[in-house]
């Protein structure tokens, strides 16, 4: 086996059961692919009290600029009901032109293809006129506390600087070449608790039902809309994700009621301005007597979740143009430049250099029978190799 073969690379990685937070041998396998290519490889274990220690990998080829980073993760989500899989989730079996296994598209496949692309570039042209690095974590599918964010800090403290980054997440909804992610919405979560007075459901005047107040508050968060979208982002959207009263009895008015929410927001907002708007809405709704006639304003508190994600947009023309033209040349289609979807580790990388995301088709990620077309692995490798050639030609000019 040589690192130029993306299929063999991916089979090796899938056969490592690296369900977060387990390394599972995946970083060891990646190390074994990169070291013979001339990369200097560091294994970095990150820790934080109350969380699982996570092993990460940073590898660099070359010492000069320009410097291109590829970022990704070898950790995967649990397999679910293994008996429901057509092929064992860590066997990496090929059937009818598809390679099955947990992580096939999210995102061991992207890593396997970029390794193959770099190996082919070296085989054809020698090392690049600059530097290529791999920044790979084992904590993307988990809490993301001991992963990319700490690996970036570790590398930056040692003098590492990057000119651009490609994240190999599965960005394509239907076909390879559909979409490049050039930014991501921000994400902010919180929990509202309304405090009432417990009592008998038949005597509501002797109690104060917090559910009524909670309904007022959550309604105010969902309507009216926060905005109508911007040129680069879809409208901000808030979803109530949990509702709880902790009350199993149908004839008891509960003492408190809580609801959690998450909002994905565009570049009309910052975390600070969005929090202020949410607090304004809650304060106004607390005094709304529609559901609580004759009652004083609802008593409530709000707790914000740690580590909100900030919205970002990449406008680096050289990075986007090099990748777009590579996709058009190899796949024959012009990719959409999108900011849709959830968050990724690009939210951390954007603080260090321009970053975009492009990988495989994501239709089966996290599903039973996660799989990738073998032909797509070859196509993605060719796209990545062409991108490497064009980015260094542009960045070095």
From Swiss-Prot:
Transmembrane segments: none annotated. Its EC number is 3.5.1.18. SUPFAM superfamilies: Bacterial exopeptidase dimerisation domain (SSF55031), Zn-dependent exopeptidases (SSF53187). Zn(2+) 2 binds at residues 106, 141, 366. Binds 2 Zn(2+) or Co(2+) ions per subunit. It catalyses: N-succinyl-(2S,6S)-2,6-diaminopimelate + H2O = (2S,6S)-2,6-diaminopimelate + succinate. The keyword Acetylation does not apply. GO terms for biological process: diaminopimelate biosynthetic process; L-arginine biosynthetic process; lysine biosynthetic process via diaminopimelate. One of its GO terms (molecular function) is zinc ion binding. Keywords: Amino-acid biosynthesis, Cobalt, Diaminopimelate biosynthesis, Hydrolase, Lysine biosynthesis, Metal-binding, Zinc. The keyword Disulfide bond does not apply. PANTHER family: ACETYLORNITHINE DEACETYLASE, N-ACETYL-L-CITRULLINE DEACETYLASE. Catalyzes the hydrolysis of N-succinyl-L,L-diaminopimelic acid (SDAP), forming succinate and LL-2,6-diaminopimelate (DAP), an intermediate involved in the bacterial biosynthesis of lysine and meso-diaminopimelic acid, an essential component of bacterial cell walls. This is Succinyl-diaminopimelate desuccinylase. It comes from Rhizobium etli (strain ATCC 51251 / DSM 11541 / JCM 21823 / NBRC 15573 / CFN 42). The lineage of its organism: Bacteria, Pseudomonadati, Pseudomonadota, Alphaproteobacteria, Hyphomicrobiales.
């Amino acid at each position: 086996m040589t690192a130029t073969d993306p299929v063999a690379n991916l089979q090796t990685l899938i056969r490592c059961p690296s369900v977060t937070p387990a390394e599972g041998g995946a970083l060891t396998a990646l190390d074994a692919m990169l070291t013979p290519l001339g990369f200097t490889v560091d294994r970095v274990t990150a820790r934080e009290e109350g969380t699982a220690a996570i092993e990460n990998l940073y590898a660099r080829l070359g010492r000069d600029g320009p410097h291109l980073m590829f970022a990704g993760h070898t950790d995967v989500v649990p397999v679910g009901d293994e008996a429901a899989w057509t092929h064992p989730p860590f066997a990496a079996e090929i059937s009818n032109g598809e390679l099955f296994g947990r992580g096939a598209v999210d995102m061991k496949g992207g890593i396997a293809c970029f390794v193959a692309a770099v190996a082919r570039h070296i085989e054809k042209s020698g090392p690049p006129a600059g530097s290529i690095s791999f920044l790979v974590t084992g904590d993307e599918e988990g809490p993301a506390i001991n992963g990319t964010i700490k690996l970036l800090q570790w590398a930056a403290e040692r003098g590492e600087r990057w000119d651009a980054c490609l994240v190999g997440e599965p960005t394509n909804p239907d076909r390879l070449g559909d979409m490049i992610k050039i930014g991501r919405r921000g994400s902010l979560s919180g929990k509202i608790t309304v405090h009432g007075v417990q009592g008998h459901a038949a005597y509501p005047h002797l109690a104060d039902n917090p559910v009524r107040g909670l309904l007022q508050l959550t309604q105010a968060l969902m309507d009216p809309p926060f905005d109508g979208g911007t040129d680069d982002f879809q409208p901000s959207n808030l979803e109530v994700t949990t509702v709880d009263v902790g009350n199993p009895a149908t004839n008891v008015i509960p003492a408190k009621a809580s609801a959690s929410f998450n909002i994905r927001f565009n570049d009309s907002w910052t975390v600070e301005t969005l929090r202020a708007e949410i607090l304004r809405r809650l304060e106004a709704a607390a005094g709304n007597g529609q559901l609580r006639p004759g009652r004083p304003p609802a008593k409530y508190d709000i707790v914000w979740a740690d580590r909100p994600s900030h919205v970002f947009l990449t406008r680096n023309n050289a990075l986007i143009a090099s990748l777009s033209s590579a996709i058009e040349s190899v796949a024959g289609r012009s990719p959409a430049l999108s900011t849709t979807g959830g968050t990724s580790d690009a939210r951390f990388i954007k603080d260090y250099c321009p970053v975009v995301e492009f990988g495989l088709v994501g239709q089966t990620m996290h599903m039973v029978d996660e799989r990738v077309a073998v032909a797509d692995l070859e196509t993605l490798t060719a796209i990545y190799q062409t991108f490497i050639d064009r980015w260094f030609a542009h960045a070095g000019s």
